[in-house]
């Protein structure tokens, strides 16, 4: 009995992104730079949306919620990863692994649904502009955010208890840099094929539901844009939607590779590389993709920077 308890609740060992990195401090500096850039850029975007009245619209409200989710998402994984890189002590407790596993699933699921519902916002803005204030009222916006978090939480509450109840009586070494589901299941000494099939169906549903909303919304948007007579209106509509489509393609593409494509088609090293892309790089890229081509956001940033420079000059004088 003692051995059984130990096999279930003992600590795990995270092997990391690169198990045998030749320059660990260089890797640490790179990951830290990406982490700080991600946190700073998302915080700046949230502040700009909050203080600039021109950005008090449903679209920017949803973007601020996406930034908040990205901050929580990257903070769930990267700090532990950085500590492991510096201390060379890669152990993570069973409780810590469970918490990380739950938060990762919840936040990832919330992003799937939020990106899907954000396409509905674009559909209403372009296809039904006269009804936009009613169809995207503040109440509707909060319902969209709540629905996204609820969808993600269901994923976390369903999969986490089942994944963590398997007896891990083989090696305790997780060939990953965080407690991701496929890497954890490889440590189980019981047959997990039935659960993996159920998880596969669950992941398909988690992707299919928001992806259906995205496909339907952008099909209607393309039809509406095609019928527009003014070139300026077309350009503005395309520019508004292109950033969202880039983010959707990056996040959904990486998730489909990891959870939908059969595991025989990719190696553990490839899994870690793809996971690093959508857990570390995507939270940094999202604010850049949405902001660089957005005149409202860049204008708000220039306005704030101008105020800071002016106040600095006055103080110095």
Curated annotation (Swiss-Prot):
One of its GO terms (cellular component) is plasma membrane. The chain crosses the membrane at residues 23-43, 61-83, 98-118, 140-160, 198-218, 245-265, 272-292. It is found in: Cell membrane. Belongs to the G-protein coupled receptor 1 family. Gene3D superfamilies: Rhodopsin 7-helix transmembrane proteins. The lineage of its organism: Eukaryota, Metazoa, Chordata, Craniata, Vertebrata. Pfam families: 7tm_4 (PF13853). The keyword Nucleotidyltransferase does not apply. The keyword Membrane applies. Residues 1-22, 84-97, 161-197, 266-271 are extracellular. This is Olfactory receptor 2T27. Residues 44-60, 119-139, 219-244, 293-317 are cytoplasmic. It comes from the Eukaryota. Glycans are attached at residue 5. GO terms for biological process: detection of chemical stimulus involved in sensory perception of smell. One of its GO terms (molecular function) is G protein-coupled receptor activity. Disulfide bonds join 97-189. It is a multi-pass membrane protein. Odorant receptor. It comes from Homo sapiens (Human). Keywords: Cell membrane, Disulfide bond, G-protein coupled receptor, Glycoprotein, Membrane, Olfaction, Receptor, Sensory transduction, Transducer, Transmembrane, Transmembrane helix.
